[in-house]
Amino acid sequence: MLAIEVKNLTKNFNGLKAVNSISFKVKEGEIFGLLGPNGAGKTTTVKILTTLLKPTKGKANVWGYDILTQRDEVRNSIGIVFQEPALDNRLTGYENLDFHARLYGLNKTKREERIKEVLNLVELQDKAKVLVKNYSGGMQRRLEIARGLMHYPKVLFLDEPTLGLDTQTRRHIWDYILKLNQKEGTTIILTTHYMEEADFLCQRTAIIDFGKIIVNDTPFNLKNILGGDVLSIEAEPVKEAFSVFQEFPWVKKVSRHNGFIDLNVEQGEKKIPLLMKIDQKEKGFEIKSVNLRKPTLEDVFLHFTGKTIREREASQSEKNKMVMQRRFKR
């Protein structure tokens, strides 16, 4: 069964296409990722699928229900963890969950049973009676996930669930997400701009940029598009080194970002000695360091867009600023 089916979904905001005719499907029980920079259209897509925004064009079904004509059925089938905190800091963890469950009409017996289940799932059972204002950022995020599960949703939307958390806490949240998917069988739609998060959690990932889905596949298959190895080289001057590396027949692709030059090659360990044989003085550059690694989703993003996700975030911000300036000049 398909948990979500999206066809040619579009959303315009005053001349700006936040979502541009995207289509994708999510299978029941799957963790599906929308991966892209800030401003790419991820959150707008989630808001449309959760009936918080109406699309300009296109169709979508969530758990078999039309997002436009069956909004109540959609809302009863989903849970949402928003990017911005939505807990009441004046209540305890237990009280936050109890309040949410009451909104969905769970009786007292069912509420108490479910609160115990979800608190155990995110390992907050010992903090149930503590005021949320005394929770750490990671604990609050775990409680928000627990709250999103209170009414037994078929589909759970997680919008940037680890944004602003430190690396260790982020990895703990990943473990809880995997556990709830495996233990409860919940279908999860995850938005993120963290490449390693999508790689670790998602069975399939759609890379979205400027409102369009660029490519959609498993993280393994996406990285396999590039194949082989990546030699990440620090060299000075970059321009001269880049020109020389482009001439090598054994280099499949050359790209540069953040002061480094990346070479996509086969059997990278055998290519490092070839690099070291270059007469660097004659060619007019110096190799400072060489790092051998496998392709990442960052490399995939760079391959399809020509920029890293951080560079794209900067250009998206500049584009939005220009649109706003033109609007105010009218």
Where are these regions (language model features)?
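Catalytic Walker B motif of ABC-type/P-loop ATPase nucleotide-binding domains
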Residues: 156-159
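ABC transporter nucleotide-binding domain
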Residues: 175-266
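Short, charged/small-residue-rich alpha-helical element at the C-terminal edge
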Residues: 230-308
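Conserved ABC ATPase signature
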Residues: 131-135
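Conserved ABC ATPase "signature" region
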Residues: 98, 102, 109-127
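Conserved catalytic motifs of ABC-family nucleotide-binding domains
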Residues: 152
